[in-house]
Swiss-Prot record:
Catalyzes the condensation of iminoaspartate with dihydroxyacetone phosphate to form quinolinate. SUPFAM superfamilies: NadA-like. GO terms for molecular function: 4 iron, 4 sulfur cluster binding; metal ion binding; quinolinate synthetase A activity. [4Fe-4S] cluster binds at residues 110, 230, 320. This is Quinolinate synthase. It comes from Bacillus mycoides (strain KBAB4). Pfam families: NadA (PF02445). Its EC number is 2.5.1.72.
Length: 368
């Protein structure tokens, strides 16, 4: 079942009046509603959100940080999640039944999460079992649908974040001989390589051809990577790095591990969103940085650190387009509906899916 089938009710079109309101009018109304509702309303905002949204966030962070913060908030009745659908799903699964999770715009999806649907994954697992038998354990990046998390949960696997991927991959190899990593091949490849697994012992499962792509000996394969990627981080290239090295030879290059292996290998540093933020925060004044991650976050880091020279690794970088569907008009629309005693775009994950997905989430949370 897809995300849109799980949500009641669904409204896609923003009412016209929100498109004609001034920014100042909308900002004033959001403040009024936040003040009126107090602790009953909680607004988590992802690092990749626009400033117009982040300014109203009660907490900012990466996807799992925000879901955990939401889960720890027992006062809020309404959690208006300013992120994308898989994040809102995770928040719904980790919060109580009487808490209502709302996504301001149902079109705010994630192309990478959508690259692994449950039918493809079940089919792949059966085919891979013919090759490798009961020697595999699945791990999924938290940037995945609730259904994929549930698949991992019922098959003994777990979720991972970019911050704890090494720890979780290491754990996986204490459970089984082989790892199936969904849905981001780059995070899986970079993590496994950092742990000493050579590239020739990694294969890629292509869900479009239902085939395993590999160069080495099939018996030696330890990591099976799902053929998925982040559309934002895929756009950072080795050529970008070469240009920075040529034009700014004293500049540090730091990238997210969702970038491809070649880019990560050519960079000075690679790590999660939090790692990047903390690294720049701790860097001395006057230091120079080229950052390979989402544009809204890079621009915010630039604004927060005027004492440092910071640029985007790719000067023609675009923001995460689906994340950017959450904007001030949609946020206000969601809040005004709550104010009227109505809810739009409520995220509800089925009970069985929740139970199995929480197994995968808890296997991670109890180890990190």
């Amino acid at each position: 079942m897809g995300i849109l089938e799980k949500v009641q009710p669904i409204e896609v079109m923003l009412p016209e009046r929100y498109q004609t309101m001034s920014i100042l009018e909308m900002e004033e109304r959001v403040r009024e509603i936040k003040e009126k509702m107090g602790a009953l309303l909680f607004i988590p905002g992802h690092h990749y959100q626009k400033d117009e949204v982040v300014q109203f966030s009660d907490a900012a962070g990466d996807s799992l940080q925000l879901a955990q913060v939401a889960a720890n908030n027992k006062e809020a009745k309404y959690i208006v999640f300013c992120g994308v659908h898989f994040m809102a799903e995770t928040a719904d699964m980790l919060t109580t039944d009487d808490q209502i999770v709302i996504l301001p715009d149902m079109r705010a999806g994630c192309s990478m999460a959508d690259m692994a649907d449950i039918e493809q994954t079940e089919r792949a697992w059966k085919e891979l079992a013919k090759l490798f038998g009961d020697t595999m354990i699945p791990l999924t990046y938290v940037n995945s649908t609730a259904a994929i998390k549930a698949f991992c949960g019922r098959n003994g696997g777990a979720t991972v974040t970019s911050s704890n991927a090494k720890q979780m991959v290491s754990w996986a190899f204490t459970q089984k001989e082989r790892l199936v990593f969904l849905p981001d091949q780059h995070l899986g490849r970079n993590t496994a390589y950092d742990l000493g697994i050579p590239l020739e012992k990694m294969a890629v499962w292509n869900p479009h051809t239902d085939s395993l792509e590999y160069d080495g000996d099939i018996e030696e394969i330890q990591v099976i990577l799902w053929k998925g990627h982040c559309s934002v981080h895929q756009n950072f290239t080795v050529k970008n790095i070469e240009n920075v090295r040529k034009n700014h030879p004293d500049m540090n290059i730091i990238v997210h591990p969702e970038c491809c292996y070649e880019v990560v290998a050519a960079s000075d540093y690679a790590g999660s969103t939090k790692y990047i933020i903390d690294m720049i925060e701790a860097a001395p004044a006057g230091s120079k940085w080229a950052i390979g991650t989402e544009m809204n976050l890079v621009n915010r880091i630039i604004q927060q650190h005027p004492d440092k020279e910071i640029i985007s690794l790719n000067p023609f970088m675009c923001p995460c387009l689906t994340m950017n569907r959450i904007d001030l008009p949609h946020l206000l629309w969601a809040l005004e509906n709550i104010e009227r005693g109505e809810q739009i775009n409520v995220i509800r994950v089925e009970k069985q899916v929740t139970e199995e997905a929480v197994l995968a989430l808890n296997r991670m949370l109890e180890r990190v």
